[in-house]
Curated annotation (Swiss-Prot):
Gene3D superfamilies for this protein: MazG-like
CDD domains, per the entry: NTP-PPase_HisIE_like (cd11534)
Name of this chain's protein: Phosphoribosyl-ATP pyrophosphatase
Pathway: Amino-acid biosynthesis; L-histidine biosynthesis; L-histidine from 5-phospho-alpha-D-ribose 1-diphosphate: step 2/9
Pfam families named among the record's database cross-references: PRA-PH
Annotated family: Belongs to the PRA-PH family.
Annotated EC: 3.6.1.31
Tagged with keyword Transport: no
Keyword Iron tagged: no
Length: 107
């Protein structure tokens, strides 16, 4: 079991985002504007879904890592702290998924 966390990855992503785009893939993605990292996130999510459907565990682990990385790049580029997303997840765990979805449909 690893001690590496999503918060650890987030710190690395945000550090690399502050680097020069010539030196950092992360910075290059963010410098390209929100469309580029969002497109990469979508591509990786589709690849993860395909690996899941195919039952390819090794590929799914790899693609899931790509999804998490690219999601953190999108968040960093949008100025959204990981803590804000984690707080939303925590809030959602206080009620059932069905109750949470029903609450979102109310005007």
């Amino acid at each position: 079991m690893t001690t590496f966390t999503l918060a650890d990855l987030d710190r690395i992503v945000r550090s690399r985002a502050a680097a020069s785009p010539e030196e950092s893939y992360t910075a290059k993605l963010i410098a390209a504007g929100p469309g580029k990292p969002a497109k990469k996130l979508g591509e990786e999510a589709v690849e993860a879904a395909i690996a899941a459907v195919q039952g390819d565990r090794t590929s799914l682990v790899s693609e899931a890592a790509d999804v998490l990385y690219h999601l953190l790049v999108v968040l960093a580029g949008g100025g959204i702290p990981l803590e804000e997303v984690m707080a939303e997840l925590e809030r959602r765990t206080t009620q059932s998924g069905l109750a949470e979805k029903a609450a979102r449909r109310r005007p």
